[in-house]
């Protein structure tokens, strides 16, 4: 299943000679939080009404003129909508979260684009101002199953990117008087009001438990009147996903990206996952040359990604891996930065976790891998395709000598290792003979990648 790494946090892979490292607690370095919202399109009556009601447009941190309610002092209305204003006029689909180590905004954005391409707009029934617990919100009568399905797809699909809540964050949530089921949801999804507890709503006030009944009545009637024009003008439809950003604790959540839904299927769904193409073969077989040829001849294919390796060796000519020293490599590994880790030829190799987001977004990932790692790969990623590249022993020696990277005992060691692994007979292992010209081998590899789609 995509998302598993085949590497236990805090230990080296099985078969390594070194002692295990201690388990390291992982936390997000960034203070930025992201939330997945529905927000009405900018110039719609709904967006205009929501912005003037709360006193802030979702796309800007700056306040705007707030609506005037006769009988309610402006300072009182401002204080009773302060938290709602900070979060902006929206409906939550996935509650705020920090990005987990190894993921960045580009991963979030590419997953969001893939997600939205598989979603269809949902027209909401009977949008009304109603009390929800101790605050006021716009709520709807339906279609509840479709809305709940969309929210749950958001919660599950993007959870790969979510950093776990810290102990203080968990404790703060638990103080809200959660029941056992809500506590379990908090632990699982980072938010207690998911699954059967999810209620689609667009918050209009903060908690009103300490406000006078007359004040609450006046604000509710004003809200009903304020949104009546939008209700009459155009139906409200969940037609896009908004990514909102909180730059630092307490800052306003500001709209960063709004991505329209564009699903063409009969029903909304999750994006189809991409596949891993794990290219292996002995030293000198020409993997790097083949992969470079394919990369050049597939330029512009946004659905094909060539994973960068992290290696404990300095980069040389025509190489593009991330070079780190051994201590840094194992710190990254213990911190959960890698989806794959292996060792070969006295070097450490890692593939960063960003490939998991690529796969979720439906992109195929090509990896320059290791034959020894194939069993672990297929355990962690059962759908992976292994491309086993081979050539004659004499040709391997010629190519190793020509590249002049290893000499003497190091060269002999690589030649000896070339004989230590035999291709697996599993169905997802594809043999590729690279004994001929580069163009011929490269075209074979490119055909494999294209035919597998």
Curated annotation (Swiss-Prot):
Keywords: ATP-binding, Nucleotide-binding, Transferase
Catalytic activity: alpha-D-ribose 1,5-bisphosphate + ATP = 5-phospho-alpha-D-ribose 1-diphosphate + ADP
Kinase in keyword set: no
Parts forming coiled coils: none
EC number(s) stated in the UniProt entry for this protein: 2.7.4.23
Region Ribose 1,5-bisphosphokinase, residue ranges: 272-453
Matching InterPro entries: DUF1045, GK/Ca_channel_bsu, P-loop_NTPase, PhnN
MF terms (GO), sorted A to Z: ATP binding; ribose 1,5-bisphosphate phosphokinase activity
Pathway as given in its UniProt record: Metabolic intermediate biosynthesis; 5-phospho-alpha-D-ribose 1-diphosphate biosynthesis; 5-phospho-alpha-D-ribose 1-diphosphate from D-ribose 5-phosphate (route II): step 3/3
Protein name: Ribose 1,5-bisphosphate phosphokinase PhnN
Enzymatic class: transferase
Function: Catalyzes the phosphorylation of ribose 1,5-bisphosphate to 5-phospho-D-ribosyl alpha-1-diphosphate (PRPP).
HAMAP family xrefs: PhnN
Biological process terms in GO annotation: 5-phosphoribose 1-diphosphate biosynthetic process; organic phosphonate metabolic process
UniProt xrefs under SUPFAM superfamilies: P-loop containing nucleoside triphosphate hydrolases
Region (unknown): 1-271
Disordered: region residues: 1-21
Family stated for the protein in its record: In the C-terminal section; belongs to the ribose 1,5-bisphosphokinase family.
């Amino acid at each position: 299943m995509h998302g598993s790494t085949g590497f236990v946090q805090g230990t080296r892979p099985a078969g390594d000679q070194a002692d295990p490292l201690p388990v390291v607690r992982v936390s997000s370095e960034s203070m930025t939080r992201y939330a997945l919202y529905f927000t009405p399109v900018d110039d719609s009556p709904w967006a205009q009404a929501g912005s003037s009601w709360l006193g802030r447009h979702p796309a800007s941190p700056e306040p705007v003129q707030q609506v005037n309610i006769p009988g309610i002092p402006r300072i009182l209305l401002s204080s009773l909508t302060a938290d709602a204003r900070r979060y902006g006029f929206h409906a939550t689909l996935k509650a705020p979260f920090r990005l987990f180590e190894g993921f960045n905004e580009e991963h979030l954005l590419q997953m969001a684009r893939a997600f939205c391409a598989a979603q269809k707009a949902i027209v909401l029934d009977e949008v009304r101002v109603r009390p929800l617990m101790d605050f006021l919100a716009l709520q709807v009568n339906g279609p509840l199953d479709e809305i709940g399905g969309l929210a749950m797809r958001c919660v599950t699909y993007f959870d790969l990117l979510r950093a776990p809540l810290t102990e203080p964050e968990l404790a703060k949530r638990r103080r809200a008087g959660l029941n056992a089921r809500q506590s379990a949801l908090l632990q699982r999804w980072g938010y207690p009001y998911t699954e059967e507890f999810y209620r689609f709503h667009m918050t209009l006030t903060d908690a009103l438990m300490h406000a006078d009944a007359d004040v609450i009545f006046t604000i509710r009637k004003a809200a009903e009147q304020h949104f009546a024009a939008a209700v009459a003008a155009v139906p409200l439809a969940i037609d896009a996903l908004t990514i909102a950003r909180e730059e630092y604790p307490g800052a306003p959540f500001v709209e960063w990206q709004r991505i329209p839904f564009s699903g063409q299927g009969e029903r909304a769904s999750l994006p189809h996952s991409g596949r891993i193409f794990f290219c292996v073969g002995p030293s000198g077989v020409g993997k790097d040359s083949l992969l470079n040829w394919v990369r050049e001849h597939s330029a512009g294919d946004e659905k094909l990604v060539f994973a960068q390796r992290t290696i404990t060796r300095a980069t040389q000519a025509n190489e593009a891996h991330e070079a780190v020293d051994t201590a840094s490599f194992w710190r990254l590994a213990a911190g959960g930065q890698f989806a794959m880790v292996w060792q070969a030829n006295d070097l450490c190799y890692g593939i960063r976790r960003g490939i998991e987001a690529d796969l979720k977004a439906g992109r195929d990932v090509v990896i320059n891998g290791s034959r020894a790692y194939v069993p672990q790969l297929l355990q962690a990623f059962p759908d992976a395709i292994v491309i086993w590249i081979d050539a004659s022993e004499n040709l391997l020696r010629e190519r190793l000598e020509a590249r002049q990277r290893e000499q003497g005992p190091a060269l002999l060691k690589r030649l000896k290792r070339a004989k230590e692994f035999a291709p697996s007979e599993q169905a997802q292992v594809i043999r590729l003979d690279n004994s001929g010209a580069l163009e011929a081998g490269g075209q074979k590899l490119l055909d494999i990648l294209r035919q597998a789609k």
